[in-house]
UniProtKB/Swiss-Prot annotation:
Disruption phenotype: Cells lacking this gene are unable to produce oxytetracycline. GO terms for biological process: antibiotic biosynthetic process. Pathway: Antibiotic biosynthesis; oxytetracycline biosynthesis. One of its GO terms (cellular component) is cytosol. NCBIfam families: PPOX_MSMEG_5819. Involved in the biosynthesis of the antibiotics tetracycline and oxytetracycline. Catalyzes the C(5) reduction of 5a,11a-dehydrooxytetracycline to yield oxytetracycline as a major product. Also catalyzes the C(12) reduction of 5a,11a-dehydrotetracycline (12-dehydrotetracycline) to produce tetracycline as a minor product. This is 5a,11a-dehydrotetracycline/5a,11a-dehydrooxytetracycline reductase. Keywords: Antibiotic biosynthesis, Oxidoreductase. GO terms for molecular function: coenzyme F420 binding; oxidoreductase activity, acting on the CH-CH group of donors. It comes from Streptomyces rimosus subsp. rimosus (strain ATCC 10970 / DSM 40260 / JCM 4667 / NRRL 2234). Belongs to the pyridoxamine 5'-phosphate oxidase family.
Length: 142
């Protein structure tokens, strides 16, 4: 499993993140999305109402490199920022979305983490930034 228990708890509490894909001409495309974490697979699952026709879906089908960010600012004074940043590869899948969310299209995007960077979710901000590469032994896809 590539995610720690604290990462899973944080991600489950959020529900929205930003997915960055690579466009047809190499330009970044960054959009807000709803998501779920699949603990069994160790992946992030992204669904949507018109997923199969979306630019993000087409981008992933052509170039599987993605970044995904989930963050929040639970306190402004003093400022507290928490985040999970995932770099990895993604699949544009023709089925599975409707199983997860009946109101969504059947197409979905599945993210396989290769690197995870976090800050602020450990409960102690003095611990700083945590970064690690995900190996096949961790449940990552190579």
């Amino acid at each position: 499993m590539p995610f720690t228990q604290k990462e899973i708890t944080y991600l489950r509490a959020q529900g929205y993140g930003r997915l960055a894909t690579v466009g047809a001409h190499g330009e970044p495309h960054n959009v807000p999305v709803s998501f779920e974490i699949d603990e069994e697979r160790g992946t992030i699952e992204i669904t949507g109402r018109d997923m199969g026709r979306s630019r993000k879906f087409r981008n992933v089908a052509k170039n599987d490199r993605v970044a995904f960010v989930v963050d929040d600012v639970p306190c402004r004074d003093p400022e507290v920022v928490r985040a999970v940043v995932i770099h990895g590869t993604a699949q544009a899948l023709p089925t599975g979305g409707r199983e997860r969310r009946p109101h969504c299209a059947d197409e979905m995007i599945r993210i396989h983490p290769r690197r995870i960077v976090t800050w602020g979710i450990e409960g102690d901000l003095s611990t700083g930034v945590h970064a690690r590469d995900i190996t096949a032994e961790d449940g990552g896809r190579r």
